[in-house]
Swiss-Prot record:
Subcellular location: Cytoplasm
Activity under varying temperature: Optimum temperature is 39 degrees Celsius.
Signal peptide residues on this chain, from the entry's feature table: none
Protein name: Xanthohumol 4-O-methyltransferase
Catalytic activity, reaction form: xanthohumol + S-adenosyl-L-methionine = 4-O-methylxanthohumol + S-adenosyl-L-homocysteine + H(+); desmethylxanthohumol + S-adenosyl-L-methionine = xanthohumol + S-adenosyl-L-homocysteine + H(+); isoliquiritigenin + S-adenosyl-L-methionine = 2'-O-methylisoliquiritigenin + S-adenosyl-L-homocysteine + H(+); trans-resveratrol + S-adenosyl-L-methionine = 3-methoxy-4',5-dihydroxy-trans-stilbene + S-adenosyl-L-homocysteine + H(+)
Name of the coding gene: OMT2
GO CC annotations on file: cytoplasm
Activity regulation info: Inhibited by S-adenosyl homocysteine.
Entry keywords, A to Z: Cytoplasm, Methyltransferase, S-adenosyl-L-methionine, Transferase
Amino acid sequence: MELARNDQTEAALRGEANVWKSINGIADFMVMKCALELRIPDIVHSHSAPITLAQIASSVPDSPSLNLSYLSRIMRLLVRRKIFSQHKSLDGEEVLYGPTHSSRLLLSKTTLPDQVTLAPFVAFMTHPYLSAPWSCLARCVKEGGNGFEMVHGGRQLWDLSPGNPEFNKVFNDGMASTARITTMAILSEYRDVFCGICSLVDVGGEFGGSISAIVKSHPHIKGINYDLPHVVATAPTYTGLVSHVGGNMFEWIPTAVAVFMKWILHDWADEDCVKILKNCRRAMPEKGGKIIIVDIVLEPEGNGLFDDAAVMLDIALMALTRGKERTEKEWKRVLEEGGFPRYQILKIPALTSVIEAYPQ
């Protein structure tokens, strides 16, 4: 009897602890934002060995009256979240902070060809334009729609970029950072996915970073970067590799043997995805064509490395877009309605998966 009572007490305490952790979950994200604004990852990684709090403080830019106690509290949570490692000095008197694999992904700039950073994506997701829509989740459930449009007068996320250079840069840099990490994972694990393709159009390809990397790795491919006119207008030139085409994927898609879409369809409702997929089908030949979709395949009951992040990102899409993350069953339905009844899912070492779909 006593044992059962103790078990119930333990369960109740765990439940309470879980609620407290969720209540304060915003601290994780905002402390990460704080660390990037203070350039803490850059500072720690610029040293060859773990460094003291005072060394970090002395290197924070534009901070003549930095509060060392506050900085210590910020570092305490970052260590607890394993963003940084913590050590003792040789005399045991001081705490030292060192880099981790996580902090490497938060550097402001990459210097090596195989190096990636998600710092721009953190800056994007914590931008004030994206913060307010989260308070509208209950209204989203009651009324449908998404929080971003509710807060911003019916304008979608991408509607704010053309007339706002500051947000446009934050948006583009954020998308480019996720594109790079995903494209590198694909090229390292599934190079064969691009074999036998003579032409490839990257729909929603932003500035062309992904398609240029693919063509460099597979020189036989004619690469087309396709995005809205105001996006490709400022895209860099990839001489001999990629041509830029401006347009609207809901209206038409440039002709190619294969279509590549990375983190695009999850931004849209099912009926919108079907329209896009049908346009993709029209853009490719009757035989030999395929679509390569790079997106999350949800496993709600899964315990994989990225499953928790995937479910959380699905809620972000509810707040910010008209889209959602999809299970395999949901992907199958959308693909079939869009004209792609055959598909296979390839796992890659990333948050996303590769879905190869065929019109026959």
